[in-house]
Amino acid sequence: MTKNQNFIETKEYKRFAEFCDACIKYQYIGICYGQPGVGKTLSSRYYTNWNTIEKQVNHRGWEDLASKTTDDILSVNKIFYTRPAEKQTRLSNDLYSISASIDLGQKLHIVNKYGHDHSKHYSDMFKYIDLIIVDEIDRLKVQHLEQLRAIYDEHNLAMIFIGMPGIEKKLSRYPQLYSRIGFAHEFDNLSKDETHHILEYKWQDLGFDLKLEDFTDYEAITTIIKITKGNFRLIHRLFAQIDRIMDINGLDKISTEVVETARDSLVIGIR
């Protein structure tokens, strides 16, 4: 699924959103873990509206920031952050920079669009931030975890760490941080019924109607479910190949042969 496509709120997403809401309510640190491709990052970005906000806070100075802001910036109370693999700077600097950009963007937008001074004093760093989601927590070193703990202790907010299964064991080695974790959530694969639901949307995206009474459609769906095993990312990668194969060959029907050819075109992720 690309950033421009509609997000489908699955049961797993709704469970994740409830988990995030609980962390905010109690101002806890939470950990969310799951296999690659189940939808952790996509769900986090959707929950924080980060696809919209990220474009506004990534700027080249205040004039650039002022030209990008929309009313969405005014309601920002969550931050989504992924630690770049190549950067060695302080993680806390990145988070403070994002928060400062949100703060400045809110001020500039109110002044420029509404012609009056900002109604709230966005001065205390993270004052209006309720939640920071940190993706790929597995990448972080001890000093980065300590920086996150310091931010959590200094500000009234919640944090959620996103990672692979087993991340809770890694974090347990750092008792000062681990003692602050209040909730844990496993992000699971899609159920068979939800995969069916997603596939209906994917059929429509390609301009086709899914008809389960049509054996060709039924057989294709069964094959896709068997291949992807409910893995969200794998479904979308497979359909990108299906779309390409059908376009090249001028086909108007998704068959098992098309699905298997698409599977063989994928570099990784199929066993």
From Swiss-Prot:
InterPro entries (alphabetical): AAA_22, ExeA_AAA_ATPase_DNA-bind, P-loop_NTPase
Keyword Ribonucleoprotein: no
One function term, GO molecular function aspect: ATP hydrolysis activity
Superkingdom classification of source: Bacteria
UniProt entry keywords in alphabetical sequence: ATP-binding, Nucleotide-binding, Transposable element
Pfam families membership: AAA_22
Positions annotated to bind ATP: G34, Q35, P36, G37, V38, G39, K40, T41
SUPFAM superfamilies in UniProt: P-loop containing nucleoside triphosphate hydrolases
Protein name: Potential ATP-binding protein
